[in-house]
Amino acid sequence: MDRGQPSLEPAAAAPRASGRCVIAPVRAVLRLRRRVCVLRKRRLLQPGGGPDVGTGAPRPGCSPRAPRADLDQPKFFTFDSPAELPSRTPRKKRRRSRLVLYPETSRKYRPRVEHRSRAQRCLLLLVAIVGFQVLNAIENLDDNAQRYDLDGLEKALQRAVFGQPAAVSRIVALMRDYLATHVHSRPLLLALHGPSGVGKSHVGRLLARHFRSVLEDSALVLQYHARHHCPEARAAQDCREELARRVADVVARAEAEEKTPLLVLDDVELMPRPLLDELHGFLQPQRSHHFHNAIYVLLSGAGGAEVTRFVLQNASRALPLRPDGFRSAEAAAAQAEEDLRASLLAVLSREHPLWQAAAIVPFLLLDKRDVVSCFRDEMAGEGFFPDQARAENLAAQLSFYRVAGREFAVTGCKQVVATVNLL
């Protein structure tokens, strides 16, 4: 080979070297591009990944490596421009805060209740039972009192008894309080005191009649007249035994029927001391409870002189009251009546201790107006026309105490029946 001709081997080696220098960077760029495409596709496959989620448009150069899911999804043609597609990309869902979990033995909103002991529960149950019993007892109070029709008794006494409004009110009030319950620790002992003819025996008869009607058994009402059942000729011990037997029979029968009997004893001032001792024995705590569930009404003229003196001394207080001074006068009258009961109790207690356990009910003197009312009532009952003028003429024939411009009958209405019978 001639030295003057250039050799072709170095010329061929130079293009090879330059080709290798160009291909190597291109291959590196392709590898980087493929890796970027793979990373982007992985982000697309992850939930909530990247802003390109849901576009479905792979980057140029990444189509050869597209996942199978993108190839299988159908393609729909729309008139939306490519610029509008990114605006419809779904927003990322906000991550909700996780719920706070509580233990199963506790509550979410209420504090944990402290454990109560069994003793506290038993105490609450006991309080509930006692409260129920108290309410039941309160409801039964009216039921037991309604059996005796005390409202009807009060109306009957106010209609038939003249001049004794305070005594009638006190009798009904005491009976109403006592008859509110059936079981009692002590009996009710009413002592009606006053002079003759003021209505004590009349009230006793009205009480006996009313209780016979409401109890529907006359055997539960005992009327004992000392003048008739125990005259002076009879031995006091025999009278005492008879009284004890009759009272025992009545209270035993009433206990069997679960009712409260009524025992009316008239002319108690004529009773010998053994009978008063027997009556006092009925009130003792050691006696059977049968004797405690009863109403004893004692009618006596003892203390009549004390009542007469009190009425005559306080006659001016009973004058017609002015409307402006009604309350003060009523309070003064109540205080005077309380003083009268206290003085009667002091006088009667000296005679026998029986009166210390009694509720004293004083019967005052009747004025002329009350006596006229007695005459009119008796005349109507006997078939006469109750003329006011004629009744006043009959009342004028009686004796009266004249004090402070008022007239009080000496014998009350005791002579009214005999006077009307002479018509």
UniProtKB/Swiss-Prot annotation:
Record keywords, A-Z: ATP-binding, Membrane, Nucleotide-binding, Phosphoprotein, Transmembrane, Transmembrane helix
Query: Chief localization class?
Result: membrane
Name which cysteines form disulfide bonds.
none
Q: Any idea which GO molecular function terms this record carries?
A: ATP binding; ATP hydrolysis activity
- Residue positions, PTM Phosphothreonine: 89
Q: Name one Pfam family in it.
A: Torsin
Asked if the keyword ATP-binding belongs to this entry, the reply reads yes
Q: Where are the bilayer-spanning segments? A: 122-138
Q: Which residues bind ATP?
A: 194-201
Membrane topology field:
Single-pass membrane protein
Location of region: Disordered: 47-68
Top-level taxon? Eukaryota
Q: Where in the cell is it found?
A: Membrane
Q: Which residues carry this modification: Phosphoserine?
A: 63, 81, 106
InterPro entries, from UniProt?
Answer: AAA+_ATPase, P-loop_NTPase, Torsin
- GO cellular component terms listed in the entry, alphabetical order: endoplasmic reticulum lumen; extracellular region; membrane; nuclear envelope; platelet alpha granule lumen
Q: Which family does it belong to?
A: Belongs to the ClpA/ClpB family. Torsin subfamily.
- Could you tell me what this protein is called? Torsin-4A
